[in-house]
Amino acid sequence: IDITRLTLEAVKPFELGAKFGARCKNLWTLGLMFWLFGRERDTTTAWLKKKFGSKPNLAEANIAAMHAGHIYGETAELPNGIGIYQVPKASLEPGTYRNINGNEATAWGLVTGCKLAGIPLFYGSYPITPASSLLHNLAKLKHFGVTTFQAEDEIAAVCAAVGASFGGALGITGTSGPGVALKAEAIGLAISTELPLVVCDVQRGGPSTGLPTKTEQSDLFQAVWGRNGDAPLIVLAAATPGDCYYVAMEAVRLATKYMTPVVLLTDGYLANGAEPWKIPDVSSFKPFPVKFHTE
C-alpha cells in the first residue's frame, strides 16, 4: 500500500504541502487499523480536535487522513484473508482498576514481598534499557523501607546487593541480558553462600550489547545455565504487565524461603506496556516472615 501517496491525496484540500502532509500518514494507517479491528473513530476524532485546538486546519487534516484510511479498508480489494477482525470486550472482575506497566508492577511487587517477609529492600543497579525505570520507581518508595543504589557498573550493583543480603536485607538487582552476563560470578557467590538475591532481567534484543529498544525473550538458557560450576537457581517469568506484580512477590518469597538467588524474567514489551490492573487487597496476602541464621 502506497500510504504516503494516499495520505497526500486525502489532505490535499488543506494545502499543507508535501512535507507536512506526509506527517499525517500515521493517522491514515490508524484509520485502516480501526477498520481492520472494527473500532470506532469518535474518541480519536475528539482527541485530535483537542490536541490541535489552536490549529484547527491541522486537526481536520489528520481527521481526514484517518477517515481516508478507514474508507480504503472498506473499499479496497485486499488480499484474501485480510478483513475485519473483531476483538471481544475484555471480561474484568469487579473491583478498582488502574493502568500499570510491567516495571512499575515489578517494583511494587518487590516492595510488597519484602513487607510480607518483614525485611528491608535494597535495590542496586546500573542504568540499562529497558530496566532503568525499576530504579526510578523504587527510588520513589523509600517510605516503605526501600534503599536504592545506582552503581558505577553491573558488577558493583550485584555485589552491593549480595552484601545487603549478607547484612540482613533482601538484595535485589535489575538489568537486561548483557548485564546478566556480567553479574554471573557474583550470582554464583550468592548461590554458594546461600544468600537470597533477586535478579530482575528485563530482556532485550541480543546478542552482545544488542538492541536496547528491541524486545526478545532469549535469556532463558542464560538465566538457567549461565554460570560456571554447579550453580543452580530458581527462574520465574511474568506473562503480562500486571502479572509482574505477583511474580515479583513470589520471587521474594522463594529467595527468602530457600536462601537462594531467583531470576525474574520480563521483557521490554512487558516493562513498557500497560494494562488495566485490579488493585489487590494487600491485607489478604499471607506474610512469610524471614529468619536469617546467625550461627
Model-identified regions with their sequence ranges:
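Gly/Ser/Thr-rich loops at beta-strand to alpha-helix junctions
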Residues: 22, 26, 35-37, 99, ...
